[in-house]
């Protein structure tokens, strides 16, 4: 396996494949993005998890994918129009409530957390938690929005790992002429890794040539969200640096079979 270039940020310094549990591991009974799911991933030996952060109306960074609360949690509405004192009462099922980002970083101090900032209102609350927990070395900031990602990086007082937003990735993937390719690399100058789907609309996105190209530029390549063992093997054979999965149990089995599991 290539090292994808020497990582300059602690988050990516691992020495092996990065196995990342997407919103934790449910064990087929726990809600995604719950503290129980994160703890299940830790029990499996995972050292990396991916999660989503939004903010309540009063500025508390919470672990939540969708803006609107799901039916059946005992509360309705958009999380950014509700205060934390109310959101904390929502029940996700299996005895789980909505955790805060600070809950997660505090409860699992050795876990590295890939944070997808889902809304502009969550930027400052996320930054404040990272600063308060001094968690710069164990978080990665990502977002589908380049504007959100870059604003978070500007507000943080220390360097953190970052993955490319959709705009930067599209610029790189569609660049053809030399001038366009130079622009694409400028778009990605402040990122440490790319996190890509293996396929998009049936078209391969991660290819051996692209993996080699990103490695040559010193960027790691992480594939998401991969739940099939045969696809995991194919991507690992392409030399991807990490895989993000809903099936942490299967990824663990695949890495064990390849002799590449070291507690993720």
From Swiss-Prot:
Active site: 22, 65
UniProt xrefs under Pfam families: GDPD
Any one GO MF annotation of this record: metal ion binding
Membership in a protein family: Belongs to the glycerophosphoryl diester phosphodiesterase family.
Name listed for the protein in its UniProt record: Probable glycerophosphodiester phosphodiesterase 2
Database matches in PROSITE patterns: GP_PDE
GO-annotated biological processes: lipid metabolic process
Reactions catalysed according to its record: a sn-glycero-3-phosphodiester + H2O = an alcohol + sn-glycerol 3-phosphate + H(+)
EC number: 3.1.4.46
Broad enzyme group: hydrolase
Described function: Glycerophosphodiester phosphodiesterase hydrolyzes glycerophosphodiesters into glycerol-3-phosphate (G3P) and the corresponding alcohol.
Keywords of this entry: Hydrolase, Metal-binding
Binding residues for a divalent metal cation: 50, 52, 65
Originating species: Mycobacterium tuberculosis (strain ATCC 25618 / H37Rv)
Domain GP-PDE intervals: 17-255
The keyword Lipid biosynthesis is annotated on this UniProt entry: no
Cofactor(s), names only, from the UniProt record: a divalent metal cation
Superkingdom assignment: Bacteria
Keyword Cell cycle: no
């Amino acid at each position: 396996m290539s090292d994808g270039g020497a990582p300059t940020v602690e988050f990516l310094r691992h020495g092996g494949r990065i196995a990342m549990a997407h919103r934790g591991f449910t064990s087929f009974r726990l809600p995604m993005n719950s503290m129980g799911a994160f703890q299940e991933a830790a029990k499996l030996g995972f050292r990396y998890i991916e999660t989503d952060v939004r903010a309540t109306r009063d500025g508390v960074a919470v672990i939540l994918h969708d803006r609107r609360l799901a039916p059946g949690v005992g509360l309705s509405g958009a999380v950014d129009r509700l205060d934390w004192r109310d959101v904390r009462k929502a029940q996700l099922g299996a005895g789980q409530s909505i955790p805060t980002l600070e809950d997660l970083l505090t409860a699992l101090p050795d876990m590295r957390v890939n944070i997808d900032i889902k809304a502009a209102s969550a930027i400052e609350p996320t930054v404040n938690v990272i600063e308060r927990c001094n968690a710069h070395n164990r978080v990665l900031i990502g977002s589908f929005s380049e504007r959100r990602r870059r604003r978070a990086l500007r507000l943080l007082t220390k360097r953190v790992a970052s993955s490319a937003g959709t705009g930067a990735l599209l610029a790189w993937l569609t660049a053809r002429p030399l001038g366009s390719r130079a622009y694409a690399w400028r778009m990605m100058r402040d990122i440490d890794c790319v996190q890509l789907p293996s396929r998009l609309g049936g078209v391969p996105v991660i290819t051996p040539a692209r993996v080699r190209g990103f490695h040559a530029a010193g960027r790691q390549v992480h594939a998401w969200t991969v739940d099939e063992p045969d696809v995991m093997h194919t991507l690992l054979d392409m030399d991807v640096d990490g895989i993000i999965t809903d099936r942490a149990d299967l990824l663990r089995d695949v890495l064990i079979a390849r002799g590449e599991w070291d507690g993720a």
